[in-house]
């Protein structure tokens, strides 16, 4: 089955799933007589009726994100397995792979640098260097293609940026930066592993040179899986990359909903112009804040073909803390006076949809207990949101575990069942992250342990 057939099948299944889900939710059928009050105000009272309708409308805050995911998943083929180079690697621009770390896991960094460098050579890459930016010296072995940059303890940015933003800004200082304005930087987390496809996609993007920033897909199920629960939960993020992220970059060339902090490709001149020096509000989710400022400056973005590999958090506590930091960082970004509403409007809707999850989750119990009169367009949109979000888990598993279930439909079925079983856990964790994030301290940067040797 070639990639075109797979994509056509996926589109047909997605549309059928959305329609069937709406049908089984009763969107197209009239409720049994006497089960739905004709006047909710008379049955529930004015205040409670308003609350019920507000909850329904709140559930649609995520609609723009769902529509972008739908368009991204249907408009672009996600099943092409090989990325073709458009030009010889020898003629490609100079690329710096930059890894930022606290220095707590030196062995992990060393092993991944070696593995990634080997992948670069296998892809035929010549013009590159790896730069490890660390708070603590990790004493990498001497190598002309590896540069270790230790951020001085006394270093302070002009605005007081902290954590990863501070380290990234240090690399851009005149007396530290060794790159030319036309060179390119690929930002990686300390556990990120390159693939030949990702390198080909990066070289194509850099060679094209039309856009200053780019990003691709990260999957989390390669190699040994430490925690199946968190890995299956992260399958949603893979589908989100293939849907919303791809759609916003391919069609609009703007980070309308923000972007991730890894597998980030930037042109040096543009990155130095935008900078990471945006104070405390730009230090918790420095990636998201950076993308908003770059969009404000008029820079353009594109989607990069080829995937990279990372690990999901190893523990439920790390999973919770990771989500909490994302929520707090996006909250600070959305509420920043430095970014105009026109640039952060869709990001804000996405944030508020996330922040109101504890309330919208209650509808699972409230809808059967307090039914409201039918409104076909409104009810269909609600069922569409639910159907698409469920499908995202399924699609994410199909993409993430493709190397593990080849020629085994039984194994694929097990992975899909596992993903669906993790949904209640994921909802619980996301709700807990919202509560902890909204009412907890917003000046902390939790570092997730991705070193498998410490587990």
UniProtKB/Swiss-Prot annotation:
SUPFAM superfamilies: Nucleotide-diphospho-sugar transferases. It holds the Pfam family Glyco_trans_2_3. This is Beta-1,4-mannosyltransferase bre-3. Glycosyltransferase with a proposed role in glycosphingolipid biosynthesis. Involved in susceptibility to pore-forming crystal toxins in conjunction with bre-1, bre-2 and bre-4. Involved in resistance to the nematotoxic C.cinerea galectin Cgl2. Has a role in determining brood size. GO terms for biological process: carbohydrate biosynthetic process; protein glycosylation; response to toxic substance. Its main location: cytoplasm. Keywords: Cytoplasm, Glycosyltransferase, Insecticide resistance, Transferase. It comes from Caenorhabditis briggsae. It is found in: Cytoplasm. Its EC number is 2.4.1.-. InterPro entries: B_mannosylTrfase_Bre-3/Egh (IPR027389), Glyco_trans_2-like (IPR001173), Nucleotide-diphossugar_trans (IPR029044). One of its GO terms (molecular function) is beta-1,4-mannosyltransferase activity. GO terms for cellular component: cytoplasm. Transmembrane segments: none annotated. Pathway: Protein modification; protein glycosylation. Belongs to the glycosyltransferase 2 family. It comes from the Eukaryota.
């Amino acid at each position: 089955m070639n990639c075109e057939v797979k994509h056509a099948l996926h589109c047909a299944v997605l549309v059928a799933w959305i329609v069937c889900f709406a049908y089984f939710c009763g969107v197209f059928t009239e409720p049994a007589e006497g089960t739905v009050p004709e006047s909710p105000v008379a049955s529930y009272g004015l205040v409670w009726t308003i609350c019920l309708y507000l909850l329904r409308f709140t559930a649609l805050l995520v609609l723009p994100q769902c529509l972008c995911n739908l368009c991204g998943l249907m408009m672009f083929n996600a099943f092409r397995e090989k990325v073709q180079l458009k030009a010889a690697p020898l003629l490609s621009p100079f690329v710096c792979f930059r890894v930022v770390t606290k220095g707590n896991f030196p062995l992990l960094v060393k092993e991944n640098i070696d593995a990634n460098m080997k992948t670069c050579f296998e892809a035929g890459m010549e013009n590159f260097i790896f730069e490890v930016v660390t708070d603590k010296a990790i004493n990498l072995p001497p190598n002309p293609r590896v540069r270790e940059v230790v951020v001085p303890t006394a270093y302070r940015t002009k605005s007081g940026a902290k954590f990863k933003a501070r380290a990234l800004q240090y690399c851009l200082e005149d007396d530290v930066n060794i790159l030319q304005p036309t060179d390119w930087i690929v930002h990686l987390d300390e556990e990120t592993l390159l693939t030949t496809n990702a390198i080909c996609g990066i070289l194509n993007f850099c060679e094209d040179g039309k856009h200053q920033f780019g990003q691709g897909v990260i999957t989390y199920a390669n190699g040994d899986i430490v925690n199946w629960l968190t890995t299956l939960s992260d399958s949603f993020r893979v589908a989100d990359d293939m849907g919303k992220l791809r759609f916003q970059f391919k069609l609009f060339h703007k980070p309308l909903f923000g972007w991730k902090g890894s597998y980030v490709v930037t042109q040096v001149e543009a990155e130095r112009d935008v900078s990471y020096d945006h104070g405390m509000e730009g230090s918790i989710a420095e990636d998201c804040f950076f993308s908003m400022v770059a969009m404000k400056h008029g820079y353009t973005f594109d989607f990069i073909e080829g995937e990279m590999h990372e690990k999901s958090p190893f523990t439920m506590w790390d999973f919770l803390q990771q989500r909490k930091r994302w929520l707090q960082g996006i909250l600070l970004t959305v509420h920043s006076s430095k970014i105009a509403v026109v640039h952060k409007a869709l990001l804000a809707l996405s944030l508020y949809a996330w922040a109101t999850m504890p309330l919208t989750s209650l509808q699972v119990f409230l809808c059967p207990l307090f039914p409201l009169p039918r409104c076909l367009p409104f009810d269909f949109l609600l069922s569409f949101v639910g159907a698409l979000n469920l499908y995202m888990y399924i699609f994410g598993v199909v993409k993430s575990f493709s190397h593990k279930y080849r020629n085994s439909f039984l194994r694929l079925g097990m992975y899909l069942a596992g993903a669906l079983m993790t949904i209640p856990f994921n909802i619980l964790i996301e709700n807990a992250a919202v509560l902890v994030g909204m009412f907890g301290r917003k000046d902390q940067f939790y570092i997730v342990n991705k070193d498998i040797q410490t587990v």
